[in-house]
Amino acid sequence: MKKALIIIGIALGVILVALVAAGFYIVNANLAMEHRGQDIEGSYKEMKGDYPEMIPWLDSLQKTGGLKESTLLRDGDTKVHYYYAFAPQHTGKTAVICHGYTDNAIRMFMIARIYNQVLGYNIIVPDMPHAGNSEPNHISMGYYESQIARKLAASAQNIFGDDTTKVEIVVHGISMGAATTMMTVGDDNVNKDLNIKCAVEDCGYTSCWDEFSQEITNSYGIPPFPLLYVADLVCDIKNGWCFHDASPLEAVKNTSLPIFFIHGDKDDFVPTKMVHTLYEAKTKGDKELWVAKSSEHAFSYHDNKDEYIQKTKQFVEKYME
């Protein structure tokens, strides 16, 4: 009997060690890995190929020194790099534009062009931690990224405002950037303090937990329990946040800020059903929903450029004074 208990104990210990090791692997492989968003030159090349309409705008900004760069510190440690540009005509209207998972600021320049060239807004486009020219750290699926977006919104008054011009903000993000956007605007008091007027979220998920749950099943063919639970604990210990902390769903429940929800109906990375859950969960304030036909994940603009611009412009201009 005693020998059997020892064997069982050893087996359980081996299983526990294996689970913890697998949990560390999941966290590091998904949140602290090398990725395309760290390739600046490759990002420029790919974006110019996919979105040639942005080339004249970008070339003009770069030649005239209009595309400026700066940094801020996230909680005094990680240096966050961002681009910014003034509107063609002086204004306080400003867009904070948030990139997606394994992307960087450059990979959001097609959206930045809409706000700067078409709508005539100032723009701020950050490289979130572990992307672009920002310092390596880890991806937090919108948790720390939303805090950074708020800091940038707060900085906008110093960058673009003056004694007679009060800056007003729209936040726009795609994929993880959409999750970041929703969490950025999830507190009405903060929105009021920062003068955030509206938000556009494009193919954001309901929560990091929900997204990882379906990905672990799709990628590894296993249920979330127990591996995702162990990975969640590892992330909390290692990075200071849990997967449930990154919850756009809770954010939209709490905010009355106007939000435009966009999603492709062929999205299987962030399932289209998530946008309906988010839209229905927002019971306070204005909201609009557009499901782009035949578009896969993060391709709603790519596939429907004119309609995307028209719908975004129509929504945003209702709230930006």
Where are these regions (language model features)?
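Alpha/beta-hydrolase active-site loop
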Residues: 139-160
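Conserved alpha/beta-hydrolase
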Residues: 112-135
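Hydrolase active-site cap/lid region
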Residues: 183-241
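The serine-hydrolase catalytic nucleophile loop
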Residues: 101-114
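An N-terminal hydrophobic leader/cap segment in hydrolases
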Residues: 4, 8, 15-73
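Catalytic histidine-centered segment of alpha/beta-hydrolase-like enzymes
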Residues: 295-306
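Short beta-strand/loop motif that positions the catalytic acidic residue
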Residues: 254-256, 261-263, 267
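Short alpha-helix in the alpha/beta-hydrolase fold that links the catalytic acid
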Residues: 111, 248, 257, 271-280
